[in-house]
Amino acid sequence: ASVGFKAGVKDYRLTYYTPEYQTKDTDILAAFRVTPQPGVPPEEAGAAVAAESSTGTWTTVWTDGLTSLDRYKGRCYDIEPVPGEETQFIAYVAYPLDLFEEGSVTNLFTSIVGNVFGFKALRALRLEDLRIPPAYSKTFQGPPHGIQVERDKLNKYGRPLLGCTIKPKLGLSAKNYGRAVYECLRGGLDFTKDDENVNSQPFMRWRDRFVFCAEAIYKAQAETGEIKGHYLNATAGTCEEMMKRAVFARELGVPIIMHDYLTGGFTANTSLAHYCRDNGLLLHIHRAMHAVIDRQRIHGMHFRVLAKALRMSGGDHIHAGTVVGKLEGERDVTLGFVDLLRDDFIEKDRSRGIYFTQDWVSMPGVLPVASGGIHVWHMPALTEIFGDDSVLQFGGGTLGHPWGNAPGAVANRVALEACVQARNEGRDLAREGNEVIREASKWSPELAAACEVWKEIKFEFEAIDVL
């Protein structure tokens, strides 16, 4: 027994590398992509990650004797190589449930990714996936409403929802901003959206924007007979100010508000999600800052982890890449985390980047939002890839229409309805998509004009983050 108490630095793997460990149903499991410094063996690096993100410290401390390390320590229970990468491997770590505060994504992340990413023995570290056990996920409210309740609130079924980010994102007055909102909704969109960086700036204060957008919503609803919404961005510099904006939105009677969950922070986001459920507001989530965290292949955190965290913290929509537009996202990997957002039970599937089987035990789902550099020619592919339970957002693809905003909205709605109808008739959108759009444009001059403008535009770059 005295071996453990010799002074100085000890090997982590003595305590924290336990290949014989059988994971428990209540454990939180993590898959880390580890790139150790030269000369550091994989077992030591994996054990170091487990230790530093749970109970360990760099030396023996007397107070270890006052607790049961076996009960509380993280354990590296498996290590596997990464095909084609000699210097990397995947370390699997199991964390006992009791290490984490209930209902706190903030605490979960502070423990698992808080300190260990600056660790000297590692050249780089990336959290690829987390398995959240029902015992932990059940301590969260989750999304304020979820997919089915949202469809019932909006009375929209059997098709993706259509949105549009109002551009130019900064510089419009509240009155002109509201006018653009009205034109898009009147033309046939379900939603318009504040850009993520529209908060409350000198050229347009939040209260003025909220009032003019509410007016636009009610006018468009009265004229179309459809329920309309505008994502009013409640993100603010303090939590109190954020809640004040949410309360004002509720007083206006609008259906949906918005939050930037990474820049705003998980604590603020979870508070807002609770308010939204209690007051019948839908919550649209933007992922501004995600690429700072998730873009590098060898370091940071994969977006699927940020997506799972959002489902626990709470949001009804979240931006999830497009597969086809200007922001990157590899198809299988994107569909992997789209399923993690929407579905109740997701099987482990390494080809889609899903390292663990995830059971959400009836936590409401989140609608993925495809947004960024997409236009009418992408509609068949988007309908095919994302299916009905999604929001397709065309900013420039609506407001860039040569005839104006409302015709831009008409073009998108006609294209969407044509794609959904073609799919329901059994046509193959992947193969016949362009033909479907061309046929529809014969009956819609607005769509024909849009087809002409965007016929050649593509954003073609190799994806950085491939499996």
From Swiss-Prot:
Active-site residues, record numbering mapped to chain: K167, H286
Post-translational modifications: The disulfide bond which can form in the large chain dimeric partners within the hexadecamer appears to be associated with oxidative stress and protein turnover.
Gene3D superfamilies, per the entry: Ribulose bisphosphate carboxylase, large subunit, C-terminal domain (3.20.20.110), RuBisCO large subunit, N-terminal domain (3.30.70.150)
Cofactor entry: Mg(2+)
Cited PROSITE patterns: RUBISCO_LARGE
Annotated family: Belongs to the RuBisCO large chain family. Type I subfamily.
Remarks, miscellaneous: The basic functional RuBisCO is composed of a large chain homodimer in a 'head-to-tail' conformation. In form I RuBisCO this homodimer is arranged in a barrel-like tetramer with the small subunits forming a tetrameric 'cap' on each end of the 'barrel'.
Protein name: Ribulose bisphosphate carboxylase large chain
Gene field: rbcL
